């Protein structure tokens, strides 16, 4: 026998027959400190956390359930010096009476079996009624044990049935949830909806800025182009439609008039393609008379022409762009350009232009506009072609999209056929096309990035690749450009602190170029 004070119980008290220690768990508290010494001294283990297979100790009245074992189990094991049956101390209340220890039960069974055999022999022989009472007691004990075993089996069967019911209910709930998710999910986009999104973006994105904002998509929702929210439409375009050419879109008004649309990829511009856009022409002595005669046949064709005013304006506009003008026909060119810029164009104006050009041709020997009208009627000489140089745009005009001043377009053309500005403009265009193909961006986005980086190609590439400038300074914004034009010392000081003196100087030179 062991006492609680001296801890004289066996060191293998809480050890199973196979040598594994019995594990216990009890919430922290003074009772845990008291039981900890008893369990550790008896060879058991005290777990810091709940683990599978560990006995959950609890005081009676604090927690109830078949998984909890009363703390009296440890105290009784220490007092009796043996490992008792744990089911007798469970706090579920299903067992009516306590079972005895394993050793005592085994001894009783052996004794009962011996007494039972003796009683049977005595009954057979016909000995006294005491043996009959012992046999009846033994029979009652066997019947009670059988009833207890039947109760345990019925409990296990009930637990299995409950587990099966729980699994079936869980499967039903999961199927219902999946059905609800499938029913309440977002409807997939159809091909017609994708085409409608692409057409609307193509026709309206240039007027509303980039597609990364919300103005374009909110307007699309307000116009009820699709029966969807603007968030869903934007998400569909950004993740699935942007940059893809899988759909055949209908032609827009701009594409019918031979204007490049936004969805078409930009064609590379080379020097050869630029020089071949206009038809070369030369004049031979003696062709003026034949030209005036052919103009007489060209004028009736002009009167009987059934072209729309917009097509005639396009023809006049292409004439003014593709063919350089001579000094003698500048006043005629002014009238043609003004008519192409105006909204109202009529056939009477084109007739007046043709008659004016024919008179000018008869007075000074013919000019370029007349030769363009009767382009198919001219005889081309074998002499080398003479091309007049075109005005090259400056860096700031090309990046910011500014039109050159009208006064410069009306001045005389320089006599120099090639200049460093031409090569600079060609190199800039090739660099822009390279960045467009490298970063999969439009010309508008690349030029905006170039504008924000003072026109520096290396800094622009670094900005498009990483989102920041290589020198660590921020990119220029519109407000700072306006402040830079003010003659304010405090503003200049603030800009220098923000962008650096070198960047401020470069920005001033860039805006002035």
From Swiss-Prot:
Residues 1-91 form the BRCT domain. Signal peptide: none annotated. GO terms for cellular component: chromosome, telomeric region; cytoplasm; nucleus; shelterin complex. GO terms for biological process: negative regulation of DNA recombination at telomere; positive regulation of canonical NF-kappaB signal transduction; positive regulation of NF-kappaB transcription factor activity; protection from non-homologous end joining at telomere; regulation of DNA-templated transcription; regulation of double-strand break repair via homologous recombination; telomere maintenance via telomere lengthening. Its main location: nucleus. The keyword Nucleus applies. Residues 267-281 have a biased composition (Polar residues). Residues 92-136, 248-365, 400-427 are annotated as: Disordered. CDD domains: rap1_myb-like, rap1_RCT. Homodimer. Component of the shelterin complex (telosome). Interacts with terf2; the interaction is direct. This is Telomeric repeat-binding factor 2-interacting protein 1. The lineage of its organism: Eukaryota, Metazoa, Chordata, Craniata, Vertebrata.
